[in-house]
């Protein structure tokens, strides 16, 4: 065998034994399944297995989270949420290319629960303007008529205003007479969510920096549906809570919130209604129980969004695709737990873990909205412009029948 081959073999053997020695001494470490798991970033925060650390000051809790986790890691954990993928589709985004009208006039017909302060002349995207009004004087020649509690006309001829029908309740059903249908589902002509702020402009938005330690959960309901009360009771019996409203009330009456939290009195009205101080009262609790009247896909109402606005963590029962509508890691989906006992145990442990609890608020502090950005973008706040755009795409009164 030539000498050069012997030299090569000797060199290889020396390298092999050197690497073997280094690996045994720990100087050189090869990747392994256990090593990569130890150094990977957990997608969800782990609840501490150590002694609980009850807290009431959320600002102190946030600082602990900043030190132990931080926004960079949170963004890495939830980088897919930045794309805002919606499994159930829509949360609409349309371009300007198919618009046929620069100005659209919408006349709202009959009684509607949409507040009057929505009436306005709007400057919309794509150089459009939109008049939304209940006045037939201001909209003397409307391009569309909007109906909610009344049924649109049976027939429409070319040259007549388009017929728009809105139904935002869980059992959403077309009238069969509309040209454009507004509701909460991705399949609807104009999708609209409950995530806006339009309906509570005059509320007290004071957010308490301190959370109750002895009472974890806030719940308020005055429409006492049997199935919802049973569901609420099955969880609340296991967790310290305050129940406001008529259903399962345990705070001594309907108007107890202001005596418990006097800072929640609205400045403009010392005798405010319960909903005027709703967010402020909620903000004193680490968790808010939010149960929809009906569990239907995409039917996500103000019950959930109020809790998010108040700086609390919602415990949610309702739409199976709720994650399509909310910020990343912001909601506890009660349906994902095997039992109420399991859910209650999780909530109690979370309430005593300042770092894991703060993770549920990281989306707001780190500016990671995910799908929630789209949810807010298609709320009732933006409905006038979005409806006018749809009317423009169809050509308004010149649309075919």
Swiss-Prot record:
Membrane topology, Cytoplasmic segments: 1-4
Entries under PANTHER family matching the protein: ALPHA- 1,3 -FUCOSYLTRANSFERASE, ALPHA-(1,3)-FUCOSYLTRANSFERASE 10
Metabolic or biological pathway: Protein modification; protein glycosylation
Keyword Transmembrane helix part of the UniProt annotation: yes
Transmembrane stretches, start-end: 5-27
Single GO cellular component term: Golgi trans cisterna
Chief subcellular location: Golgi
Single GO term (MF): fucosyltransferase activity
Residues glycosylated per entry: 85
InterPro entries: Alpha-1_3/4-FUT_pln, Glyco_tran_10_C, Glyco_trans_10, GT10-like_C_sf
Swiss-Prot/TrEMBL keywords: Cell wall biogenesis/degradation, Glycoprotein, Glycosyltransferase, Golgi apparatus, Membrane, Signal-anchor, Transferase, Transmembrane, Transmembrane helix
Pfam short name (any one): Glyco_transf_10
Origin: domain of life: Eukaryota
Lumenal side: 28-401
Known function: May be involved in cell wall synthesis. Catalyzes alpha-1,4 glycosidic linkages and generates Lewis-a epitopes.
Protein's membrane topology: Single-pass type II membrane protein
Tissues expressed in: Present in root, stem, flower buds and green siliques.
SUPFAM superfamilies: UDP-Glycosyltransferase/glycogen phosphorylase
Organism from which the protein derives: Arabidopsis thaliana (Mouse-ear cress)
Entry EC number(s): 2.4.1.-
Coiled-coil parts of chain: none
Name assigned to this protein: Alpha-(1,4)-fucosyltransferase
């Amino acid at each position: 065998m030539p000498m050069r081959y012997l030299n090569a073999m000797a060199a290889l053997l020396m390298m092999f034994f050197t690497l073997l020695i280094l690996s045994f001494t720990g100087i050189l470490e090869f990747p392994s399944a256990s090593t990569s798991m130890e150094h990977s970033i957990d997608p969800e925060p782990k609840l501490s297995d150590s002694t609980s650390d009850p807290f009431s000051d959320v600002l102190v809790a946030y600082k602990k989270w900043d030190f132990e986790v931080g926004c960079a890691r949170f963004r890495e954990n939830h980088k897919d949420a930045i794309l805002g993928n919606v499994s159930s589709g829509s949360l609409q985004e349309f371009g300007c290319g198919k618009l046929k009208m620069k100005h659209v006039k919408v006349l709202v017909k009959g009684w509607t629960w949409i507040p009057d302060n929505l009436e306005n002349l709007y400057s919309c995207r794509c150089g459009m303007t939109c008049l939304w009004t209940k006045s037939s004087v201001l909209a003397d020649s409307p391009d569309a008529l909007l109906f909610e509690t009344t049924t649109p006309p049976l027939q429409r001829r070319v040259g007549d205003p388009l017929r728009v029908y809105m139904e935002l309740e869980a059992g959403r059903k077309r009238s069969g007479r509309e040209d454009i249908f507004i509701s909460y589902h991705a399949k609807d002509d104009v999708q609209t969510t409950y995530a806006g702020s339009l309906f509570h402009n005059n509320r007290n938005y004071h957010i308490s920096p301190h959370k109750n330690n002895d009472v974890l959960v806030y719940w308020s309901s005055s429409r006492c549906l049997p199935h919802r009360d049973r569901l609420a009771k099955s969880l609340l019996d296991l967790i310290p809570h305050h129940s406001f409203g008529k259903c399962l009330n345990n705070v001594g009456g309907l108007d107890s919130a202001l005596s418990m939290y006097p800072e929640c009195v609205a400045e403009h009205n010392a005798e405010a209604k319960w909903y005027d101080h709703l967010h402020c009262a909620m903000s004193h609790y680490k968790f808010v129980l939010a149960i929809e009247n009906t569990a239907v896909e995409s039917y996500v109402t103000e019950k959930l969004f109020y809790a998010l606005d108040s700086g609390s963590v919602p415990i949610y029962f309702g739409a199976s695709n709720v994650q399509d509508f909310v910020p990343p890691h912001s909601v506890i989906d009660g349906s994902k737990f095997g039992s109420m006992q399991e859910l209650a145990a999780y909530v109690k442990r979370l309430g005593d873990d300042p770092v894991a609890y703060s993770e549920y608020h990281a989306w707001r502090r780190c500016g990671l909205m995910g799908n929630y950005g789209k949810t807010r973008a298609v709320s009732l706040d933006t409905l006038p412009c979005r409806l006018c755009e749809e009317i423009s795409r169809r050509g308004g009164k010149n649309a075919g029948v």
